[in-house]
Amino acid sequence: MTLLEKTRKLNRILQKTGIQPVDFMEMASILKEVIEANVYILSRKGKVLGYSALKDYGDEIFAKDKAIPEEYNDRLLRVTETLANDKGKLFKEEKALADLIVTVVPINGGGDRLGTLLLIRSTKEFTDDDLIIAEYGATVVGLEILRAKNEEIEEEARKRAVVQMALATLSYSELQAIKNIFEELKGKEGLLVASKIADKVGITRSVIVNALRKFESAGIIESRSLGMKGTHIRVLNEKLLEELEKMKRD
């Protein structure tokens, strides 16, 4: 397979980005095929995002428990540019790895270290063509990690905005009711006895019901009546608890 053909294989994954999330296991599998090595895609914290083994070289330590040992990950993070064809130096304590050829490619994006691409072979050293493909693959992985992070940030902002808008619709009495309800629950779900809250705050049960309805219609909570026992409440948007805690501090 020529360098161009190998690059085109990776391009097919890149073309999916934005339409559907990149499958890191698929990415590792394609890199394994084009580079002919065991491939591990690691997050910054050492979590195994994807891996694919060409042969059993005794390097299962990198797939075990879906994360590599912290000490090893720290060593990988200290590699700031491609380290090619390491032989028994990086992981010298591991006898199984002593005779293997290891290449480490940092995954960077947005000025940050996002993870590590690890390539392992038993004999033949990695060529310049292999390293070009590996670094290109690391770039594709970095772009996908950044995209996922941006989506997560956007989703967090959306959830917070929904909570803030819902809180803004509450009357003073309803806000006091909500504050007391979640102080009473002490967590993301629990049983609410409306009459108990009403007596404590000095409001009517209808105020509590209205406040809960507003939050339920906003998709922030769900509630289920248990008759005489009370109402079971579960928080669907965890930003609610954060905003209430912030109000308490302010």
Curated annotation (Swiss-Prot):
What are the record's GO terms for cellular component? Answer: cytoplasm
- Name it: Global transcriptional regulator CodY
Q: Which SUPFAM superfamilies match?
A: Winged helix' DNA-binding domain
GO BP annotation list: negative regulation of DNA-templated transcription
The entry's DNA-binding region feature spans: 194-213
Q: Which family does it belong to?
A: Belongs to the CodY family.
Q: Which NCBIfam families match?
A: codY_Gpos, PRK04158.1
Does the keyword section mention Transcription? yes
InterPro entries with a match to the protein in the record: CodY, GAF-like_dom_sf, GTP_trans_reg_CodY_C, Transc_reg_CodY_N, WH-like_DNA-bd_sf, WH_DNA-bd_sf
What keywords sit in the KW lines? Cytoplasm, DNA-binding, Repressor, Transcription, Transcription regulation
Give the span(s) annotated as GAF domain. Answer: 1-146
The UniProt record lists the keyword Transmembrane helix: no
